[in-house]
Amino acid sequence: MNNRAHTFLWGIRQFRTSIPRSRALRTYSLVFCKPEVIHSKRNPRNHLLNGFDEGLQPSVRYLFQDIFISKSVAGCTQTRGIIHAAGFKLDRILCPRRLSFDAKHSFVSDGTSDHDLMKTNFHHTSTEDVLTKKMRPTPVNYKKLAQECNSLSDVLDTFSKAPTFPGSNYFLAMWIIAKRISEDKRRFEKQLMFSHPAFNQLCEQMMREAKIMRYDHLLFSLNAIVKLGVPQNSLMVQTLLRTIQERISECDERCLSILSTALVTMEPCMNVNALRAGLRILVDQQVWNINDIFTLQTVMRCIGKDMKALKELGRFSVLNSRHMFEVLAAMDHRSVVLLNECSKIVIDNIHGCPFKVLISILQSCRDLRYQNEDLFKSIADYVATTFDIWKLKHVIFFLLSFETLGFRPPGLMDKLLEKVVQEPGSLTVKNIVSVLHVYSSLNHVHNVQNREFLEALASALTGCLHQISSESLLNAVHSFCMMNYFPLAPINQLIKENIIHELLTSGDTEKNIHKLHVLNTCLKLDESTYKCIHIPLPQLPLTASHPNEKLAEVLSRLLEGDGCFSRNVQLPHNYHIDFEIRMDTNRTQVFSFSEGDASSATNMQRVAVLCVPKSAYCLNSNHLRGLMAMKIRHLNVMGFHVILIHNWELKKLKMEDAVTFVRKKIYSDEALATTDESV
């Protein structure tokens, strides 16, 4: 027995030295496709001699195929092998795993003597080559698979015919196909995917492969699976999340970017939160070694680091700077330093910037509450300069974005105004409502063609009355009223009983009621032909008003007591003013309220003092926005002289300076000159 074992081991050593390892050890990727298993000469005492190569580390188990070595037990050779029906050849060992082999293709078969072992021809491969062609399917490339298949079900059909490792390729191919089809078709294809008989099999294969798959493939798979709409609480997604946690030490710079992208779209849960915590620790260690700017931005979007980004500003390309706005907005991180620097780069390279990028920048500025007049002006001037190359809907989209930022671009608005006057028929219902909203909100009035502009819009709206919704009609008429223009046909359509009833009972009723009250007020106070019309509406709730306390104290000192002004005055038509003062018509003398009541109406001027915020004006200008301009117009109709006090300016002044500031606002220049002479 000892001699036979010695001879056997000697033969193994001869095998190692007689041929190169590359000829003897054929490596294959692991195939999880439930292969056909064939047992030869099954015997419970059969077992393999593993780890026969002394050069292999004992902790690593490699995959070999078509190599088998039997062990002699009690004088007889016993074997047990497995044939794998599928497998494909690679140039390197992909994954460590133990694998049994088939005696049919072993180097030593039953009945072979120890002497014959030394004579075995290790270079004979013709039988192996024939079997290999039958056993190995063509390797699956997800890009090629996505090109060959037209639907998600086609990919699953391909998988069901010949499953191969790794399963991630099938999910990646399905996600590529899903991205290139329409939203409606994508929804239908996903339903077919979930009901496909091979889908569960693919999910099971993914879970089995998770621990041995390459880490970046695992992350790509998670991202594709989530994007395909697989429920986050499903066993497969949670298994992948848990496996990614366990293998997070394998995460390199590229994997950081993939993992951050996947986590951004996922809802919080125990495994997601744990993975984010682990990623945060990993980023703390590696963030200073990240070289790729896009990877840095993706990690910032998930984690929120901007210290590293500040050091890398000198390396930011134009593309990096444009993308940074979206990254900061996605993580709701308002880094003014980063935004300012990126704005400079965008301004310097504004020409040729695509529409989607410019809109994304403006929307990100809105989300971050970042106001950079130079950036907005640069974009507006670029669009105005290249006005003819833009579609009408693109220009309107720019103006809607500027309106949400409170920025009024006069040049661009005049360009569009002239276009509307020339071609009113090119406007759709949506275009008309949007244009009216922007111009009324920003209170933009053309010096020459304003009347023609409003008439063109009214004419275009009249032609669409048969297809416009009640809410859109209300929005359009509300905008016309703010601009002190009253088109007959749209108003007649709006005040019909059935339209009013629909507005009061459906949609955003609170907003509809408010706009209908504005319509009532404009019809009563402005010069219109509808003064006799009154739309019965529910009463609006009174809004709680808290007049500026500092301004109240300033008025008390300036007017020597509280008897000469009134606070929080409620007026008809749902208007209120912060303070009311009664003066003579020349605004040189202030009356107490008892004197004002006794004075003749011709000698008394009611003064409305309004403390207004910055939001009442367009960005960094003294140009009033639409609602405040309409309120002042209506207060003037009701007999008030309106004085606006900027609360942000008053807040910065000391009390003595504030009194002087308000005095100049209230009294006329004549009264101030008289006061200065007497002093």
Swiss-Prot record:
GO annotation (BP), single = positive regulation of mitochondrial translation
Q: Subcellular location, in the record's words? A: Mitochondrion matrix; Mitochondrion matrix, Mitochondrion nucleoid
According to its UniProt record, where is this protein mainly located?
mitochondrion
Q: Which residues are in the RAP domain?
A: 607-664
Q: Which residues get modified to Phosphoserine?
A: 113, 126
Any one GO MF annotation of this record: RNA binding
Q: What does the record note on quaternary structure? A: Monomer. Found in a complex with GRSF1, DDX28, DHX30 and FASTKD5. Associates with the 16S mitochondrial rRNA (16S mt-rRNA). Forms a regulatory protein-RNA complex, consisting of RCC1L, NGRN, RPUSD3, RPUSD4, TRUB2, FASTKD2 and 16S mt-rRNA.
Instruction: Fetch the PANTHER family from UniProt.
Output: FAST KINASE DOMAIN-CONTAINING PROTEIN 2, MITOCHONDRIAL, FAST LEU-RICH DOMAIN-CONTAINING
Q: Hey, which family's this protein in?
A: Belongs to the FAST kinase family.
Full protein name = FAST kinase domain-containing protein 2, mitochondrial
